[in-house]
């Protein structure tokens, strides 16, 4: 009986998603659209844009990084919100 109970507990833990992870787009300007699961505890997505000799560059990912002046940064807190 104890073995059956232990087996049920292990199966429940394996099958249930015990922690939620944020999903964010993570491609740069010219790359195909992709998204990824963020590390545990990372609850934000960002969209960062700046201009250089190539034109407007867009970078997307998990988190909300510090940026220098002249760089447009948008952070959000829902799945795939940084497109």
UniProtKB/Swiss-Prot annotation:
Expressed by the venom gland. Gene3D superfamilies: CD59. GO terms for molecular function: acetylcholine receptor inhibitor activity; ion channel regulator activity; toxin activity. One of its GO terms (cellular component) is extracellular region. Pfam families: Toxin_cobra-type (PF21947). It comes from the Eukaryota. It is found in: Secreted. Its main location: secreted. Residues 1-21 form the signal peptide. Disulfide bonds join 24-45, 38-62, 64-75, 76-81. Keywords: Acetylcholine receptor inhibiting toxin, Disulfide bond, Ion channel impairing toxin, Neurotoxin, Postsynaptic neurotoxin, Secreted, Signal, Toxin. Binds to muscle nicotinic acetylcholine receptor (nAChR) and inhibit acetylcholine from binding to the receptor, thereby impairing neuromuscular transmission. Belongs to the three-finger toxin family. Short-chain subfamily. Type I alpha-neurotoxin sub-subfamily. This is Short neurotoxin VAN-10. It comes from Laticauda laticaudata.
């Amino acid at each position: 009986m104890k073995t059956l109970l232990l087996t049920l507990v292990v199966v429940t833990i394996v099958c249930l998603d015990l922690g939620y992870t944020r999903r964010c787009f993570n491609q740069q300007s010219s790359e195909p659209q992709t998204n990824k699961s963020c590390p545990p505890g990372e609850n934000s997505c960002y969209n960062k844009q700046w201009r250089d000799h190539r034109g407007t560059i867009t970078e997307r990912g998990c988190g909300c990084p510090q940026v220098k002046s002249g760089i447009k940064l948008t952070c959000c807190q829902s799945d795939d919100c940084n497109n």
